[in-house]
Structures are given as C-alpha cells and as structure tokens.
Amino acid sequence: MIQLNYPLFDGEKLWEGACVSIENGVITSVEECDPAQCGDGMLLPGLIDAHVHMGSPGHVEAMLHSGITTVCDVSASRALIESSKQLEIIGSAGMAMGVVMNPKGYVEQAAENGAKYIKVLLFNALSIGKPALCGIVKAAHKRGLKVAVHATEIATVRQAVDAGADILLHVPMKEPFPAELADAIREKGIAVAPTLVMMETFAHSGRNGYKPEHYPNAQQAVRLLHRKGVPILAATDANPGTFAPAVGYGSTLHRELELLVDAGLTPLEVLSSATGNPAKAFGLHTGKLAAGMPANMLLVDGRPDRRITDSSKIQQIWVKGERIP
C-alpha cells in the first residue's frame, strides 16, 4: 500500500491536507489530514488533454512527462492506442467530414474500429449538412458515444448545438460570440474545448485569413461561455503541422492552462478544466482522486490552485499507482 499526505485538488474541490491511500493501482481512500503533516507541493489528478492528434510513441512520451495521463485523440492508429500502456488514448477512429451518405453506417464502422467517441469536422455550415449531422448524433447517442464537433464559425457552432452535439472543439475568432448562443450551449449541457493555444497560433499564422487582432474574440468567447456556466475543457489540438499550424505535445497543455486564466478562469477552475470537466464530458473513469478511481496523479512543486504556472513544476507522476521514471 502507498500513502501520500499533501495538499490536494481532487478534480472538483481543494483539500488543504489529504491522505491518499493506494493499493493495486487503485485509490482506496482520500481522507482529510492536518496540513502541518503534509509534504510540500500539491497532488493533482493526472491531466487530460481533450483534443489531440497523436502519431508516434514520441508523442506518447511527451504527454506522459508533462503530467498528462489521458488524451482524447483523433489521429492515433489502433496499433498506437493498443501499445500505449501508460497514456490512455481515447480515440475517435478518425472523423466524419465532407459528404456522409450513411450517418448510421459511419458511426457503426467507427465503433467497430474502436472509437470511444465520434468526431465531426464542420468547415462551414454546408460541409456535412443538417440531416447527416443529426443522423450521426442520433446514431452515436444510441450506441452510448459522445459527439465532439470541430466548429470555428458562429454558423457551425449553431449547427452543432442544434444537432445535439456533446462537445464543441475550438471557438470562433473572426467575430464576437453571441450571448444567446452561449445560453443555448449551457441549456443543452454542451461542453466547450476552446483550444486557445491553437487559436493563438492560428491568429499569428496568417492562415485561413486569421490575424493577430482576431485572438481577443477567442478570449471573449471563453469569458462569456464560462460566465454562463458552460463547462470548459483544456485542450491543445496538438499536431505535427500537416493540416494546421503545428502545436507541440505535452508542455503546450500547461500553456493552455495559462491562456485560460488570462481569459478569465481562476486557477482552480482551470485545474478542473484539465481533470474533472473533460472526464465528465467524455464519460471517462479518470480525472478525479477518489476511492475506486485509478491512481493516475502527479505531484507538483508549488500551488497551481493559486499560480497556474506551477502546474508544469512536476516532481512525480503515477499511472495506476506506478511511478513514471
């Protein structure tokens, strides 16, 4: 049995002093203890990057050594997913895009290929069409799968919301986000992964007509959505640069956390965005330090609940109770 006494953020709330007991890779208890008997630093659940494009074992290593124990992926091969014994890769088995003639068939094929959720790419409001998108959502939900939709325009966000998507990936940048649309997102229980690190990169890339002056609209969207009570998910869109501006693996999640603080979330709320929030949004059995949960966690130097930059000061990482060297 392993016992650890530290200040702790459990994915939902803060403990100034907690004793965590671990046996056979599973947390058996989390109990309050005297902060004076705790070590320096803070325990956090293993971090979750809610939107990535994994392509190699090197990407897996970069994620793990940045304290990320779970990723929600679009691009990883089945072989990479199955060979990754420490980093949990929640895959979508590709994405729906363009013309989808048989929405139900697409979802069934993705599920057969190992999809744990369905990803839909909406370049614009005409790229898939309302009937096909609604069909994908209906078929996915019937199989118990969540649907995450890439939407970077107000029109595509509306389309995804109307279709009943569960998660929105990215936020529009070329125009301010409407308050009534944020209300609709909250009312439907949709979570949003703004990927600010990608939006910031796009804004300075000159690609797709983006300009640096567009980035404040992304920040405005996050502030508004957060104020309305929409769950925010930390996500980077980490990718090698083959289809979008490259965003690195692992360390960029900590940059994302900083950008979320800049956009108006508190450090404690941002920690939720990288742990409990994505676990709830994707229906994952991780992201929380509680009895019965896998002992995926990290010890950081400092207090990231007060200074979010401390999230990157990683001292130790555990996956299922085993320390990562």
Model-predicted segments: where are they?
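N-terminal metal-binding scaffold of metallo-dependent hydrolase/deaminase domains
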Residues: 1-33, 301-307, 322-323
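Divalent metal-coordination and catalytic microenvironments
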Residues: 6, 20, 25, 40, ...
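Divalent-metal coordination cores built from histidine and acidic residues
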Residues: 60-147, 152, 181, 187-205
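Glycine-enriched alpha-helix->loop->beta-strand junction motifs that scaffold or abut catalytic
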Residues: 114, 161-168, 186-191, 229-231
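Catalytic cores of alpha/beta
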Residues: 154-162
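His/Asp/Glu-enriched, well-ordered alpha-helical/loop segment
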Residues: 217-300
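C-terminal cap of metal-dependent C-N hydrolases
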Residues: 291-325
